[in-house]
Amino acid sequence: MTLVMKSSRFEVEPEALFAFHMDAENLARISPPWPPFVPVSTPQPTRLGDIQVFRVGPWPVARTWQARITQLVPGRLLEDTQEAGPFLRWRHQHRVTPDGDGSRLTDVVAFRLLPTRLGEFIEYLGVRPALWAMFTYRHWRTRRLLANHKG
């Protein structure tokens, strides 16, 4: 599987950063406008085994993305695994760790688009850079939203 990782430091307590990511509604708030990402069903509070459903992409080609919460270590780790969506396989971990007087968020995604060499080529040249850019944007938005909430 192809791996993408993005890590950033935040000037908030790890508990606040983790709580922010436990609210699935925040995903729409931090996602870039490309492609559109709309929550359809996001049980609150987030629990192990929950299924979260989103619509991804512009109308009329939007797809349903269904992910299950497959790991949950309160305050430290939230993992979602795609059950239905655009990827053959998708596992995304949100890891939160203390970092001095703040915290660190590390997003780790392991994915497979297609089970072929062409799929690996597309993943490496297209999907990987797009995901890295998306997580860079999400970390920036998270930082801004947490700063606004804090102040």
Model region roles, listed by residue range:
Residues E13, P74, D99-G102:
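Short strand-connecting beta-turns/loops that link adjacent beta-strands
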Residues L3-M5, A62-Q66, R89-H92:
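Short, surface-exposed coil-to-beta transition loops
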Residues S7-E11, R55, R68, R95-T97, ...:
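Generic structural detector for well-ordered beta-strands
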Residues M1-R47:
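Hydrophobic ligand-binding cavity/cleft-lining segments
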Residues A133-R141:
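A non-catalytic, amphipathic alpha-helix used as a structural packing/dimerization or gating element
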Residues V38-A84, R104, W140-R143, N148-K150:
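Glycine-rich portal/gate segments that line the openings of hydrophobic small-molecule binding cavities
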Residues T81-W132:
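Beta-strand/loop substructures that line and gate deep hydrophobic ligand-binding cavities in soluble
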Residues L17-H21, L27, Q52, I69, ...:
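Hydrophobic pocket/interface hotspot
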